[in-house]
A protein has these predicted regions:
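Charged alpha-helical initiation segments
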Residues: 1-58, 78, 90
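Alpha-helix boundary/N-cap detector
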Residues: 5-17, 24, 28-31, 35, ...
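Amphipathic alpha-helical scaffolding segments
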Residues: 39, 79-87, 193-203
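Long, hydrophobic, amphipathic alpha-helical segments used as structural scaffolds
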Residues: 48, 70-82, 185, 210-213
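Structured extramembrane domains adjacent to transmembrane segments
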Residues: 51-53, 57-58, 62, 73-83, ...
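Hydrophobic alpha-helical packing segments in soluble, helical-rich domains
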Residues: 59-77, 115-129
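Flexible secondary-structure boundary motifs
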Residues: 86-165
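Charge-enriched, short contiguous segments at helix-coil
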Residues: 139-214
Length: 214
């Protein structure tokens, strides 16, 4: 999407905004994550400043890529290694359960957990801890992986992250609404606020996830 108002100076404002928000955490993250955030800010700038550009779907698509990139770096790589080392030659029974299938795909195909899968998965693990609900094999391995890592225990199961993920999931911006013909301004603002705290609130989803890998 071309823009007459998005120039080099405006881009540097966005770059500095992102750098100031994430600080030294950016040094530990893939450059592609940074690039996705810059592109999302470019599209957000166009959406909020130019007439005739009313569709927020491109922004949500780029933020989804940023999420996938971050989750792969913070969760997928570490969990897959842990699960494969743990399983060795063992082949746990498979169940026709969406979350269990998602974890199997992570371990066997390096798939990434979507926002729609991560939220109920963490809720299931919380229910297991608080109410003794039995977990399916791969979900149990995921729960053990969290317990094995102090940073995961502290951040991935934190109440602030849980609340933000639940709100994002309930908004369906990255689910059913994403498959509509367009996303409106208010929905984009809500997604940006939850994922990035509008680059002001340190309790955003992306920031809380980034802290896991520090």
């Amino acid at each position: 999407f071309a823009s007459n108002s998005w120039d080099q100076d405006t881009q540097w404002v966005a770059v500095n905004l992102i750098r100031e928000y994430f600080g030294s955490y950016l040094d530990t993250l893939p450059h592609q994550f940074f690039a996705y955030l810059i592109e999302a800010e470019r599209l957000y700038y166009i959406l909020t400043t130019e007439r005739g550009f009313n569709d927020g779907l491109p922004i949500i698509s780029v933020l989804t890529k940023a999420y996938d990139c971050l989750i792969h770096e913070i969760i997928t790589k570490s969990f897959v290694k842990y699960a494969r080392d743990r399983l060795r030659w063992e082949v746990p029974p498979k169940f026709n359960d969406p979350l269990e299938r998602a974890l199997i795909a992570m371990v066997t195909k390096n798939y990434t957990l979507s926002i729609g899968r991560l939220t109920p998965l963490l809720s299931r693990i919380r229910d297991h801890r608080e109410n003794g609900v039995t977990l399916l094999p791969y979900t149990q391995i995921f729960a053990d992986w969290i317990e094995w890592n102090e940073s995961l225990e502290k951040n991935l199961l934190s109440e602030p992250l849980r609340k933000k993920l639940v709100r994002l999931n309930e908004s369906e911006i990255f689910g059913e609404k994403r498959h509509r013909s367009s996303i409106n301004h208010d929905e984009v603002r809500e997604a940006r606020s939850l994922l990035l705290g509008n680059y002001e609130n340190q309790q955003s989803i992306f920031m809380l996830l980034v802290k896991i890998g520090k």
